[in-house]
């Protein structure tokens, strides 16, 4: 029975050796997987840094764009207010023109007979003025002919007297 103890020791040593070899194999596999995970994380970290930079740039651009849009919106609001003011002015002007037109139409309707008489009298006055002018022109024309004939007669008389 003495031989059992050394055999048990050898079996225990072989079992321990198998256990150690199994643990080493598992640890080497875990190390390989951890190295692969570390490389993947390094790549992901680089990508995250790139994404972070791009996101920061995009945020800055978005902020500038927002400020630009706000500025343009403020300027556009002033233009809209000005156009509204112009629209109000045009509307007021249209109301004034309507009131003046209505007033003129009303006054014309009320004074239609008087206006008709004024037009008739002005036509009569223009006819009288035309006739007066025609008469004056005929009289001036007749005076010119008479004075022209008298001058010719006087000239012929003077010429005959001088010739004698």
Curated annotation (Swiss-Prot):
It comes from the Bacteria. The chain crosses the membrane at residues 7-27. Coiled coil: none annotated. Gene3D superfamilies: Methyl-accepting chemotaxis protein (1.10.287.950). The keyword Nuclease does not apply. GO terms for cellular component: plasma membrane. Residues 136-164 are annotated as: Disordered. Keywords: Cell membrane, Membrane, Transmembrane, Transmembrane helix. InterPro entries: UPF0478. It is found in: Cell membrane. Pfam families: DUF948. It is a single-pass membrane protein. Its main location: membrane. Residues 143-164 have a biased composition (Polar residues). Belongs to the UPF0478 family. This is UPF0478 protein SSP1024.
């Amino acid at each position: 029975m003495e031989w059992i103890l050394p055999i048990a020791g050898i079996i225990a040593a072989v079992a321990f050796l198998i256990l150690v070899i199994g643990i080493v194999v598992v640890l080497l596999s875990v190390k390989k997987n951890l190295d692969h995970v570390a490389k993947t994380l390094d790549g992901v970290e680089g990508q995250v840094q790139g994404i972070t930079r791009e996101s920061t740039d995009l945020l800055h651009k978005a902020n500038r764009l927002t400020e630009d849009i706000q500025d343009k919106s403020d300027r556009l609001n002033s233009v809209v207010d000005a156009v509204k003011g112009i629209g109000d002015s045009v509307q007021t002007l249209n109301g004034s023109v309507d009131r003046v037109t209505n007033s003129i139409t009303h006054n014309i309707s009320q004074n239609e007979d008087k206006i008709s008489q004024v037009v008739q009298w002005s036509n009569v006055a223009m006819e009288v003025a035309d006739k007066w002018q025609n008469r004056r022109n005929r009289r001036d024309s007749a005076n010119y002919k008479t004075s022209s004939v008298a001058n010719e007669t006087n000239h012929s008389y003077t010429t005959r007297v001088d010739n004698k």
